[in-house]
Amino acid sequence: MFIQTESTPNPATLKFLPGQTVLEEGTADFPNSEDASISPLAQKLFGVNGVTGVFLGRDFVTVTKEDSVDWDHAKPALLGAIMEHFQSGQEAINGAAAPDHSTEVSEEDAQIVGQIKELLDSRVRPAVAQDGGDITFHGFDRGVVYLQMKGACAGCPSSTMTLKMGIENLLRHYIPEVTEVLSLIHISDPTRLRRIAY
């Protein structure tokens, strides 16, 4: 098995390409080891010293490390953990479906939200996935779009610029009802996240 690696715009995050499917659909974000209990792959990666986050995509894995840990020391152990996982035949996530990022939408906002999601899915998410991350929609309220940045995008030094200059400008250009785009910080309780977005 040959695993390629790619750097990301976030110097604390590295993208691993195992050459096979990681998740059949969706993405999975594990910002800490406690959240990784449903993923044998993420658990193995959190077992490597200095790992602070794991993100799984369709055909890639991104790993975020502490600043004090050097990639030259962590990378061989991470490659070994990924190889061991795929050779074991285990699933990346135990019997769990990809998370559903849909939110309740008022009837008057349904068309706008549909346009927002279409632009995110066709223009934004593919570009962000190339950098080892993802952006998910979490709400639209009075002109404000709420998004969550995951994987290499979470904590990336250029994430604010991506959000404001890239995504916000794109959405405002095509959808005049959009006035602002805000990023939600990671909150482990999804019901609390939904309350913040609306």
Residue ranges and their predicted role:
Residues E6-N32, P76-A77, E84-E118:
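N-terminal presequence-like segments and adjacent domain-start helices
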Residues L23-E25, S33-E34, V63-V69, V145-K164:
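A short interface-forming secondary-structure element
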Residues N32-V48, E118-R125:
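Short amphipathic alpha-helix segments
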Residues A42-F60, D134, R172-V181:
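Short acidic amphipathic segments
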Residues V69-F86, P157-T160:
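Charge-rich, low-aromatic oligomerization/scaffolding segments with amphipathic character
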Residues F86-I93, L170-S183:
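Flexible helix-coil linker/hinge segments at domain or subdomain boundaries
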Residues E107-P157:
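Strongly charged, low-complexity linkers/loops
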Residues I185-T191:
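Conserved small/polar residues in nucleotide/adenosyl-binding loops
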